[in-house]
Design a protein with these regions (language model features):
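Acidic, surface-exposed loops and disordered segments
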Residues: 1-184
Length: 184
């Protein structure tokens, strides 16, 4: 089902959130037991589709998971995803090799889409955490089998989303020693 953004009641913000959301985004691993609103999910996905991609190939497929049993199953696929069972939603981010057969380029495109989702979630007051899958063969094969993915669709990572139930402490990560002008 496609989201209809043309006729929705969603108010388009004019960037007042972007820098605050970027500077204050944290990885959230503790969530309130509340479902996300459909409009919020649609905005998070719209942010993903607004990302740049090589040759505008948009080599992404997203599996949106809200079912608690499925989230629990996903949380058991790796020790690093244990908190996914308590999230309101998970998204499995997959590369579509029919759009670009280079997983190296797909990773760049999917990373841009993922960061857009993380920032949009933060702007909506929703926490998130990026959970690596690929290139860990055991993890991506488990997801591939679990979702019975068609040939050419490669699960790259998962993202947990939910209303925040932990103290967030954003850190200023800027490090001028890692910035070089004109030469290294």
């Amino acid at each position: 089902m496609k989201a209809n953004f043309q006729n929705s009641d969603i108010i388009v913000r004019k960037g007042e959130w972007s820098m605050d959301a970027i500077f204050n985004r944290t990885s959230v691993r503790k969530y309130k037991q509340e479902s996300l609103k459909k409009e919020e999910i649609d905005l998070i996905l719209k942010a993903a589709f607004s990302a740049p991609s090589a040759r505008n190939s948009q080599p992404w497929q997203f599996i949106v998971v809200e079912n608690k049993d499925t989230l629990k199953d996903l949380s058991q696929m790796t020790t690093y995803a244990s908190f996914l069972k308590d999230a309101a939603m998970g998204i499995v981010v997959c590369a579509d090799k029919s759009k670009n057969d280079s997983l190296d380029y797909c990773q760049q495109d999917l990373a841009a889409a993922t960061e857009n989702m993380l920032v949009e979630a933060k702007s909506l007051g929703i926490g998130s955490c990026w959970l690596g899958v690929y290139p860990n063969e055991e993890r991506y094969l488990a997801l591939n089998q679990y979702f019975k993915l068609p040939k050419g669709i490669v699960p790259m990572w998962m993202i947990s989303f939910g209303y925040i139930d932990q103290e967030e402490v954003a850190k200023d990560k800027f490090d001028s020693s890692k910035v070089h002008y004109e030469k290294y």
